């Protein structure tokens, strides 16, 4: 099997990659939402992967990952890899998770990556209040990303610990 084409469409604001093969199997991958500017970066790799075997995912990726693995190029490379794994799974008649080592758990906790609450300030207590609101949300699993670093100068807040699960999965 050989790759015959790579195309990118912007659907909404998301770059969607389609890789086609000479055997009629297509693979689809998605880049980060709200980043339509990734389209030319994804297309940059087209000629580098044409003619390659898409089921040799790691070999194809070694050839392009060196060309750019940091943002925003890394997002472009990841979308291509996603499409390659899609082809490999379809070709083998297996879901991709089986190709990646198999099922580890029956349930996966949802990460709250988009529900945000307005902050009243930038003090540690404000972050703790914001995190409590996120904890009380039905998804109850989130991460503070707003300029808080493990190595930053933010003081500890009583009862708030980095890396401690808010609630274990049932």
Task: State where each predicted segment sits.
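Short loop/turn motifs at secondary-structure junctions
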Residues: 2, 43, 138-140
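Flexible, glycine/charged-enriched surface loops at secondary-structure junctions
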Residues: 57, 96, 141-143
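Short, Gly/Pro- and small/polar-rich lid/capping loops
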Residues: 1-18
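Residues that line or immediately flank small-molecule/substrate-binding pockets and catalytic motifs
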Residues: 10, 33, 148
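Metal-dependent enolase-superfamily TIM-barrel catalytic cores that perform enediolate-based chemistry
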Residues: 107, 112-170
């Amino acid at each position: 099997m050989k790759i015959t084409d790579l195309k990118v469409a912007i659907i909404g604001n998301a770059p969607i990659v389609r890789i086609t093969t000479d055997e009629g199997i297509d693979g689809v991958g998605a880049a980060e939402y709200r980043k339509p500017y990734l389209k030319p970066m994804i297309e940059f790799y087209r000629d580098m992967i044409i003619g390659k075997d898409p089921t040799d995912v790691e070999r194809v990726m070694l050839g392009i990952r060196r060309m750019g693995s940091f943002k925003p190029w890394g997002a472009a490379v990841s979308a291509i890899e996603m499409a390659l794994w899609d082809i490999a799974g379809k070709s083998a008649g297996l879901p991709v998770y089986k190709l990646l080592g198999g099922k580890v758990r029956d349930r996966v906790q949802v990460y709250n990556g988009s529900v945000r609450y307005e902050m009243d300030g930038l003090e540690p207590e404000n972050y703790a209040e914001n995190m409590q609101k996120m904890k009380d949300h039905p998804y109850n699993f989130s991460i503070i990303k707003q300029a808080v670093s493990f190595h930053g100068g933010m003081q500890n807040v009583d009862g708030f610990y980095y890396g401690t699960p808010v609630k274990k999965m049932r």
